[in-house]
């Protein structure tokens, strides 16, 4: 009897082993499928919202630098390589001297616009990146020359966010704003003729992932 039961026991163990491997294989397949679905959902969630902008920026910038922003959601803020990061914006300091309109065009071609200062902290950060020997165009102008200053992105021109040098603006023919370092007061805004050639500062919103 013992000799007859041994093959059955071996066959039973083989069948159990086969079943276990089958269950394991199915489990792995299901997990893989879930992973793939998760990746697809994540891909569409991430790139569905930012894909259009990333696609547009790809023609201007070859790479992005991303920074962890702690517990914020989304947690990664990205700027084009060599741009400066502050708050929710990226900044590029251009050393090419151009007239105001060409400076703005240069920013637009990089997916940005001339800088708009919303806070003193923002300006304080930017001036640390500037060369005191040069002045830089801002995204602020007075197209009609009637002291009706306007930001390039339509941000309201607030009285509490104005950093003009003492006595500025002072001439209706000077319809564009620049930031310049004057001793002993330091950095401040000055109205200048738009057709003069100056350096400039570009600003764009960060890309969040």
Swiss-Prot record:
Ca(2+) 1 binds at residues 116, 118, 122, 203. One of its GO terms (biological process) is positive regulation of T-helper 17 type immune response. One of its GO terms (cellular component) is external side of plasma membrane. Ca(2+) 2 binds at residues 168, 170, 174, 190-191. Keywords: Adaptive immunity, Calcium, Cell membrane, Disulfide bond, Glycoprotein, Immunity, Innate immunity, Lectin, Membrane, Metal-binding, Signal-anchor, Transmembrane, Transmembrane helix. Associated with FCER1G. Heterodimer with CLEC4D; this heterodimer forms a pattern recognition receptor (PRR) against fungal infection. The keyword Signal does not apply. Glycans are attached at residues 131, 170. It is a single-pass type II membrane protein. Expressed in lung, spleen, lymph node, leukocytes, bone marrow, tonsils and dendritic cells. Strongly expressed in purified monocytes and weakly in B-cells. In peripheral blood cells, preferentially expressed in plasmacytoids rather than myeloids. This is C-type lectin domain family 6 member A. A short stretch of the intracellular domain (AA 8-14) proximal to the transmembrane domain is required for association with Fc receptor gamma chain. It comes from Homo sapiens. Calcium-dependent lectin that acts as a pattern recognition receptor (PRR) of the innate immune system: specifically recognizes and binds alpha-mannans on C.albicans hypheas. Binding of C.albicans alpha-mannans to this receptor complex leads to phosphorylation of the immunoreceptor tyrosine-based activation motif (ITAM) of FCER1G, triggering activation of SYK, CARD9 and NF-kappa-B, consequently driving maturation of antigen-presenting cells and shaping antigen-specific priming of T-cells toward effector T-helper 1 and T-helper 17 cell subtypes. The lineage of its organism: Eukaryota, Metazoa, Chordata, Craniata, Vertebrata. InterPro entries: C-type_lectin-like, C-type_lectin-like/link_sf, C-type_lectin/snaclec_domain, CD209-like_CTLD, CTDL_fold. GO terms for molecular function: calcium ion binding; carbohydrate binding; D-mannose binding; pattern recognition receptor activity; phospholipase binding. The chain crosses the membrane at residues 21-41.
């Amino acid at each position: 009897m013992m000799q007859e039961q041994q093959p059955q026991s071996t066959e039973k163990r083989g069948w159990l082993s086969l079943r276990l491997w089958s269950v394991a294989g199915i489990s792995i397949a299901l997990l893989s499928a879930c992973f793939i679905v998760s990746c697809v959902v994540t891909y569409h969630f991430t790139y569905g919202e930012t894909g259009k902008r990333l696609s547009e920026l790809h023609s201007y910038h070859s790479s992005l630098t991303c920074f962890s922003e702690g517990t914020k959601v989304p947690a990664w803020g990205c700027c084009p390589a060599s741009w400066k990061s502050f708050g929710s914006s990226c900044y590029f300091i251009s050393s090419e001297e151009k007239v105001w309109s060409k400076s703005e065009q240069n920013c637009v071609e990089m997916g940005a616009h001339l800088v708009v200062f919303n806070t003193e902290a923002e300006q304080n950060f930017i001036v640390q990146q500037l060369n005191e020997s040069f002045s830089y165009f801002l995204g602020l102008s007075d197209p009609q020359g009637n002291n009706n200053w306007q930001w390039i992105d339509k941000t309201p021109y607030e009285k509490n966010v104005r950093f003009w040098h003492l006595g500025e603006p002072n001439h209706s023919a000077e319809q564009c704003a620049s930031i310049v370092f004057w001793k002993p007061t330091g950095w401040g805004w000055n109205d200048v003729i738009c057709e003069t050639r100056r350096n400039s500062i570009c600003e764009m919103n960060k890309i969040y992932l």
